[in-house]
Amino acid sequence: SRRRLLLDYLNQKGAACGYINLGGNVLCLGAKPDGSSYNIGIQRPFDDEGAAMLAVSVTDQTVVSSGVYERYFEVDGKRYHHILDTATGYPYDNGLLGVSIITDESVDGDGLSTTCFALGLADGMALVESLDNTEAVFITEDYELHFSSGMGTKIPYQVME
């Protein structure tokens, strides 16, 4: 995978830990130099880019997010985002604002975040629950957070005020 190639390259160069932010894809290599986990913010939709809705604590994992707030335009007060339903050609309108996937492989997270968004909350969550070493946070239009079963136990998190 691309993540494995990047990690191999960083290891060859002597990197034991690191943090790489590729927009909606954050890769954490190992733990921080002090041994603690990285705290990765998950953006509050339609807020300033730096405003986090929650933070997840990860070590040697990736956090990948997809959402309607990343790329969109408005016409007559209606937002049109970039995640399109292939059956209609229009943006999905399924009650979701965003999905964040926490997994060991960046390439898995990238595909899963968009797939889970397209599936919607119930089916997307069912898919995540069927996968090993994969957790998720879904944000619905009412700004409610929906967590997969391993969130809080396998992946610590903190909701921001």
Regions found by a protein language model. Give the residues of each.
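Mature catalytic core of soluble alpha/beta enzymes
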Residues: S1-E161
